[in-house]
Design a protein with these regions (language model features):
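A short beta-strand element within the Helicase C-terminal
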Residues: 41, 189-213, 240-245
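Conserved segment of the helicase C-terminal RecA-like domain
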Residues: 74, 202, 213-265
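SF2 helicase catalytic motif II
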Residues: 24-28, 33-76
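Residues immediately C-terminal
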Residues: 29, 50-51, 85, 152, ...
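Conserved interdomain linker/interface between the two RecA-like ATPase lobes of SF2 helicase motors
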Residues: 65, 73-157, 246-247
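Inter-Walker segment of RecA-like/P-loop motor cores
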Residues: 1-30
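Loop/turn-to-beta-strand initiation segments
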Residues: 16-19, 39-42, 72-77, 141-142, ...
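Conserved helicase ATPase core of P-loop NTP-dependent helicases/translocases
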Residues: 5-12, 164-193
């Protein structure tokens, strides 16, 4: 079978492949410009929980409607690992609900209450601890650290040996270089924002939340589950480890009213 993948933001001119893979925006642009997708038999939409995303949700909903209009006989398969209410979403999409509860690699979740200064010491300890572990398939432990700003990405990366800062503001060649080095095991730790949660595949054994905020707003359940789902990859790791470093009493004026420790307990509940 022929598979075509677009590179960057450029939309492939030939759409005669057996399988066409694209972003929501890329496929939607093809439909809007009246280009023919041919006879479509199956449409698979990954990360369908993005319907609830403030920025991309309306675009995804519109694309689904236009695809259904363009390919009325096609089978639609919607995938997500982090839908909060799958029954309601299935009803909204007029789809049959199929739930699969088994995770190939089990996850251990740990909550540690700590202050800002203590967090850095804990981060260094957790990273060093992960590096000492080797899975049954021979892969050394690696860590993804989530923080709430690009500035913190650099500050934390400088404070942790072997760490690299990764965020959406980096140029593509630099992002690609970090992805390849991490994939090869040459970088032990990536410090990132929520940018990594959306679509980048890093095989990490451990995920650490230095902050439970995205910018100045607390993470919601979907965002949190998407991020912690990075811990443990089939074929690489035997166990995924997740650590939440929550600062009691920490609040953001523009976020929800809860403190970080309260948010942590709610997300884990």
């Amino acid at each position: 079978s022929r598979i075509r993948l677009g590179k960057g933001r450029r939309i492939a001119q030939r759409l005669d492949a057996d399988i066409i893979a694209g972003t929501y925006e890329g496929i939607d642009q093809v439909i809007r410009t009246k280009k023919s997708l041919g006879r479509v038999g199956t449409v698979v939409i990954d990360e369908v929980h993005m319907l609830e995303d403030a920025e991309r949700g309306h675009r995804l909903a519109g694309m689904i409607a236009r695809l259904r209009n363009a390919a009325p006989e096609a089978q639609f398969i919607f995938l997500s690992a982090t839908v909060g209410n799958p029954g309601a979403l299935a009803k909204q999409l007029n789809a049959a609900l199929v739930e699969y509860e088994v995770r190939p690699v089990p996850i251990e979740r740990h909550l540690i209450f700590s202050s800002g200064k203590e967090k850095r010491t804990l981060l260094r300890q957790l990273v060093a601890q992960a590096e000492k572990l080797t899975s049954s398939t021979g892969y050394r432990g690696q860590t993804i650290i989530f923080t709430n700003s690009r500035k913190n990405c650099y500050n934390l990366a400088q404070a942790i040996p072997g760490a690299a800062a990764y965020h959406a503001g980096l140029q593509y060649p630099e992002r690609k270089r970090i992805e390849e080095l991490f994939g090869q095991g040459k970088i032990s730790t990536v410090v990132t924002t929520a940018a990594l949660a959306a679509g980048v595949d890093f095989p990490a054994s451990q995920v650490v939340f230095e902050s439970l905020a995205m910018g100045i707003n607390w993470l919601n359940v979907h965002e949190f589950n998407q991020m912690l789902g990075r811990a443990g990859r089939p074929g690489y790791h035997d166990l995924g480890l997740v650590y939440i470093l929550a600062e009691p009493g920490r609040r953001f004026s523009s976020g929800r009213g809860e403190s970080e420790d309260e948010v942590a307990l709610a997300l884990l509940g």
